[in-house]
Swiss-Prot record:
Lineage summary: Bacteria, Bacillati, Actinomycetota, Actinomycetes, Mycobacteriales
Family under the similarity heading: Belongs to the UPF0677 family.
Function: Exhibits S-adenosyl-L-methionine-dependent methyltransferase activity.
Protein name: Putative S-adenosyl-L-methionine-dependent methyltransferase MAP_4079
Annotated organism of origin: Mycolicibacterium paratuberculosis (strain ATCC BAA-968 / K-10) (Mycobacterium paratuberculosis)
Composition-biased stretches (Gly residues): 341-351
């Protein structure tokens, strides 16, 4: 049982469970301000400023009290690990929702939404409705704070103020939710705050509200959540921190998060969904963090849980739910080597390690077709991995939706380039460029040919906003190399001339775009540039 909870307790944003949402916002704000952020949440700091000073600001504070660090030297490392974990968790759920809506789902349900601002910051497809469920005062704080700053949701957002321990399915239906249509669900940072019986009831209700094609992602509890020794060690450490803070800063109380949790025996989340016919993939949190470049570490004993990832069951019982399938060193090496030699759709089967063999979802049991690694309709342009600089991949898709190559992140690219025309020079025009739904800077690609002995410029496709990157991929130089550097400090990209034909880009460590400037029916042959030899490769 929880020592600080009751069956019908409620809270303001600065107290009890509500204050934990501010702690998560603090971690997201710290990650957003980092040198190579995995996520971008500009609203996190807005919530912190509105809530005022409190212990929840520790993650985003420039420095902690020296007395605290002297007494607990491991706090900075633990703080850094927490920020990395929250960033990885947020990135996973972001990708999970975008991939589900990219597959055609237009109903999203965020359970215990807290200060999650996905309704405002994600590029939702047109016609998507996002239902946010949480305590009334928490949702009211979020809405009023963002409204004061002029923020507008990027979807049809529907707030459902309700306690998840009560009859929330009826409130969800009354808000307009259609249980006969596929939907995508998330339960992020929720499980330890629910009694075991309430957790089972929550899953039963999700089961009754979902149909074929639906997906669910859950952050599940780790194996040491109920371990008596781990609990005692955590309690002793919190006692020391509380006593120290009472001396150096009496006005800033340190909350006992463990007193808000329900330490009760409960069924493993992965086994529950597997027993009810769902296809489940399990990955521990350390593999999730390693996959996002946030370091490999042991699973945390409490909230570092495991989450959900997709794939049909291949036999055997699932060990739990997980966020994202990790990637071995050998698999990552094969992918990187493939990326250095020509680019394109690098796929060597289910074990090749390419991004197209990972999706963030749990498939509904009624969806018999499910998801297969070699499914022909698996839309490779819908998947990808973050690159070594922490940005999301940028995909190039031709007019028929076919895969045209994957660009490792240019600076902090956060969106996808899709469905651009790849036809004759005459089809291109120099009309006005419009930012896409992400609101970032427009990237214009200009191709230059040598026609009848003279230069002739033709504007290429205008790629809608790539995150907040202001990178300009400039002209192809006729007789020299021109380096271009991202406004956010990305690697210089060189436009290399090969005889009279277009060539690829070389960033020194990665072949970024072997086919970026290719005309499918151009009078000039399309060229690619080999990173090692620089020799041309005609098509």
């Amino acid at each position: 049982m929880s020592t600080a909870r009751s069956d019908d307790d409620s809270w303001e944003i600065t107290e009890s469970v509500g204050a934990t949402a501010l702690g998560v916002a603090s971690a997201r704000a710290a990650e957003t301000r980092s040198e190579n952020p995995l996520i971008k949440d500009p609203f996190a700091q807005v919530f912190l400023d509105a809530a005022g000073d409190g212990v929840w600001n520790w993650h985003s504070a420039p420095q902690l009290p020296p007395e605290l660090i002297e007494a607990e030297p491991t706090i900075p490392l633990q703080q850094q690990a927490m920020v990395g974990y929250m960033a990885s968790r947020t990135a996973f759920f972001d990708s999970f929702f975008l991939e589900a809506t990219g597959a055609g789902i237009r109903q999203a349900v965020i359970l215990a939404a807290g200060l999650d601002a996905r309704s405002w910051r994600l590029p939702w497809p047109a016609g998507t409705t996002v239902y946010e469920l949480d305590q009334p005062r928490v949702l009211e704080f979020k809405e009023s704070t963002l409204a004061e700053h002029g923020a507008q949701p990027a979807c049809n957002r529907v707030a459902v103020p309700v306690d998840l321990r009560h009859d929330w399915p009826e409130a969800l239906r009354q808000a307009g939710f259609d249980a006969s249509a596929p939907s995508v669900w998330s339960a992020e940072g929720l499980m330890p705050y629910l009694p075991a019986a309430a957790q089972d009831l929550l899953f039963d209700r999700i089961q009754g509200l979902t149909v074929a094609g639906s997906r669910v992602a859950v952050e599940a509890l780790g194996p040491k959540f109920l371990d008596p020794q781990a609990r005692a060690k955590r309690r002793e450490r919190m006692d020391r921190i509380q006593a120290l803070m009472a001396r150096i800063d009496p006005d800033r109380a340190v909350p006992r998060t463990d007193e808000l949790w329900y330490f009760e025996e409960r069924e493993d989340v992965g086994e529950w969904f597997g027993r009810h016919g769902w296809d489940v993939r399990v990955t521990p949190s350390d593999e999730l963090m390693a996959g996002y470049g946030r370091g490999r570490r042991r699973p945390r004993s409490a909230t570092s849980c495991r989450g959900t990832c997709s794939s049909p069951r291949s036999g055997g019982r699932p060990e739990g739910l997980a966020f994202r399938q990790g990637e071995s060193r050998a698999r990552r090496h094969r992918r990187d080597v493939a990326g250095q030699h020509g680019f394109g759709n690098q796929c060597g089967g289910p074990d090749c390690g390419s991004a197209q063999h990972r999706r963030a979802q749990v498939d509904h049991p009624a969806q018999q077709r499910g998801f297969s690694d070699d499914a022909p309709d698996a839309a490779p342009a819908e998947r990808g991995e973050p690159g070594e600089r922490g940005g999301q991949v940028v995909r190039l898709v031709d007019a028929r939706g076919q895969h045209r190559g994957v660009l490792e992140p240019l600076a902090t690219a956060l969106t996808q380039v899709r469905a651009h025309r790849m036809s004759r020079v005459a089809d291109h025009h120099d009309g006005p460029a419009r930012p896409g739904p992400g609101g970032g800077a427009v990237v214009k690609v200009v191709a230059q040919h040598l026609v009848a002995g003279r230069r002739c410029q033709h504007p290429r496709n205008r790629f809608g906003p790539i995150g907040e990157s202001c990178l300009q991929i400039g002209q192809f130089a006729a007789r020299r190399e021109l380096p271009f550097r991202s406004a956010l400090g990305g690697e210089p990209i060189q436009a290399i001339r090969t005889h009279r034909h277009m060539a690829g880009f070389d960033a020194g460590t990665k072949c970024l775009a072997g086919q970026l400037g290719v005309h499918r029916r151009s009078p000039h042959r399309a060229m690619r540039c080999s990173r090692r030899t620089g020799r041309r490769a005609g098509r």
